[in-house]
């Protein structure tokens, strides 16, 4: 993804990961030296920057973006919630990871601590009259009104 990671500690002097323009936002700053705990900054999300902290509270990851391509609103690509060596973390508000936990699968969200980021997803939506039916892999095929929706959670292709 194009989002930046948060810093771990060193609130006043460490650069955060920068987001890629049009893809994601920067991570937040963490803190250390002021308190007993060292706290990371929240990871950037597709819809907003990761939060920073100057105390012992682990900040949230940046917001993801809501996608309605499948007909139902789903948050995707949220930044990972920050980790503290003394407290549990907050998660992103839109499918980011929490402390030492895994992000939601097939939503592309970030993680925190020792967790795994969410796997990606590719969604294609087209008029059913244009759908060729030629695919590889195992996409989920659904319809919504006059449209056909292909959801790839793994390897595959579509030929139109």
Regions found by a protein language model. Give the residues of each.
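Low-complexity, glycine/proline-biased repetitive segments and flexible coils/loops
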Residues: 1-160
């Amino acid at each position: 993804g194009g989002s930046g990671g948060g810093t771990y500690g060193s609130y006043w002097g460490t650069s955060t990961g920068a987001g890629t323009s049009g893809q994601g936002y920067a991570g937040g700053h963490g803190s250390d030296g002021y308190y007993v705990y060292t706290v990371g900054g929240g990871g950037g999300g597709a819809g907003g920057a990761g939060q920073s902290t100057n105390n012992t509270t682990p900040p949230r990851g940046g917001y993801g973006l809501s996608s309605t391509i499948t007909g139902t609103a789903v948050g995707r690509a949220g930044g990972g919630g920050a980790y503290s060596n003394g407290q549990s973390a907050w998660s992103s508000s839109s499918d980011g990871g929490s402390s030492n936990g895994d992000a939601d699968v097939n939503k592309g969200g970030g993680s925190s601590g020792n967790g795994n980021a969410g796997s990606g997803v590719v969604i294609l939506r087209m008029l059913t009259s244009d759908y060729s039916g030629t695919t590889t892999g195992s996409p989920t095929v659904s319809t919504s009104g006059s449209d056909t929706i292909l959801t790839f959670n793994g390897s595959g292709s579509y030929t139109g």
